[in-house]
Amino acid sequence: MSSILVEGGKSLRGEINISGAKNAALPIIVASLLSSKTLVINNVPQLSDVSDMLFILKSCGVHVEIVESGTIALTANNISCHFSPPCNIVKKMRASIWILAPLLLRLGQVRIALPGGCAIGQRRIDLHLAALKAFGANIQLEEDYISANCSSRMHGISFKFDKVSVGATITAIMCAVLANGSTKLANCAQEPEIADLCYCLRKMGANITGIGTANISIIGVKELNGANYSIIPDRIEAGTYMVAAAITQGKIKLNNVIFKHLKSAITKLRLSGAIIQYQNENSLIIEGANIIKPLNIQTNPYPNFPTDLQAQFMSLMSIADGVSIITENIYENRYMHVFELIKMGANIVIQSREAIVTGVKKLHGADVIATDLRASVSLVLAGLSAAGITRVKRMHHLDRGYESLVEKLQNCNARVQRIPD
């Protein structure tokens, strides 16, 4: 365990290179299980979630080679149902549910522990299991385990998700690429990370159309090839550092970004008073305003405002000049950071799914506790703007989704340091 000490009150100024997207890296890493050939993945962020997923794949028999920093080569030519993914790691990662489909397709049977992850609401797996069953899998839940088998090759289906789900969309896509026949998926999640997975699978030989839309069509192939693929930049990391500039009235240049992926965040930041200029094809400069204007924000599936930026924007709105209303429509329990922000002087009232944020002139430093990945970084952001020193505890959450955050902030003159508890 470790903490981050943040001394606030300094405008951030500098340049940050955005890392590869965690939420694209994880499913693409899992996709290596779909082929016996080598998949080389570039722009892989160095995160604990990535390390844990690679460890899970190693336990399944995948050969993992670190080619160089940010590049890995995965070869799944020796996987076996006799390998057992480690329960302690599977249980703490909700993304581990994705190994079910490829292992089932390759081996015909699989048994894994129920997945975990951040303690945010009811991140259920029922949509994943419904998709697997529709493709022909037999599923049994045994206390803390999922057992699945498929007596023959999975078959193509027409399937409409009951609700938009990033994770279940990924599971269904992985089933469909090797299923026998044609699959039509409706009401799919449209996140860029799902499109990135599809483009990687297409490079491996998958037949996929409708990428990036709510309706995806896939014609199954008998086998996939290897490929060399680069992961898209992390739009959530980029949005986080944009808030860092805005909340400190600073000026930061961000490199390796995709503008269209940031459209909703950029729109809200401009409404708050920030000045954002595009520099070239993949760089932008954001300059924070002296007076931050309040916002109304509703989280919804892409291309709308992302739930993964809700906590960061709440920190920003806590010092806005007026009242903001933030509505969390994705998860029912994603306001755990609110109680920590209140310790720092924020004026926030929760009413069901709404957070009513009345801006204060200044936050003050305090000892606060991170409860999940995005909450942890929102508290660091609040600390950057606060008077005095903020200590954010349980920073292992941060390591799951932010590569070198302390170093990147220090490069922008932030007074932050990591210390052991």
Curated annotation (Swiss-Prot):
GO terms for biological process: cell division; cell wall organization; peptidoglycan biosynthetic process; regulation of cell shape; UDP-N-acetylgalactosamine biosynthetic process. Keywords: Cell cycle, Cell division, Cell shape, Cell wall biogenesis/degradation, Cytoplasm, Peptidoglycan synthesis, Pyruvate, Transferase. It comes from the Bacteria. Pfam families: EPSP_synthase. UDP-N-acetyl-alpha-D-glucosamine binds at R94, K163, V164, S165, V166, D308, I330. It is found in: Cytoplasm. The modification 2-(S-cysteinyl)pyruvic acid O-phosphothioketal is found at C118. Disulfide bonds: none annotated. The keyword Ion transport does not apply. GO terms for molecular function: UDP-N-acetylglucosamine 1-carboxyvinyltransferase activity. InterPro entries: Enolpyruvate_Tfrase_dom, Enolpyruvate_Tfrase_sf, MurA_subfamily, RNA3'P_cycl/enolpyr_Trfase_a/b, UDP_GlcNAc_COvinyl_MurA. Pathway: Cell wall biogenesis; peptidoglycan biosynthesis. Its EC number is 2.5.1.7. It catalyses: phosphoenolpyruvate + UDP-N-acetyl-alpha-D-glucosamine = UDP-N-acetyl-3-O-(1-carboxyvinyl)-alpha-D-glucosamine + phosphate. The active site is at C118 (proton donor). Phosphoenolpyruvate binds at K22, N23. The keyword Repeat does not apply. One of its GO terms (cellular component) is cytoplasm. HAMAP family: MurA. Belongs to the EPSP synthase family. MurA subfamily. NCBIfam families: murA, PRK09369.1. Cell wall formation. Adds enolpyruvyl to UDP-N-acetylglucosamine. This is UDP-N-acetylglucosamine 1-carboxyvinyltransferase. It comes from Orientia tsutsugamushi (strain Ikeda). The lineage of its organism: Bacteria, Pseudomonadati, Pseudomonadota, Alphaproteobacteria, Rickettsiales.
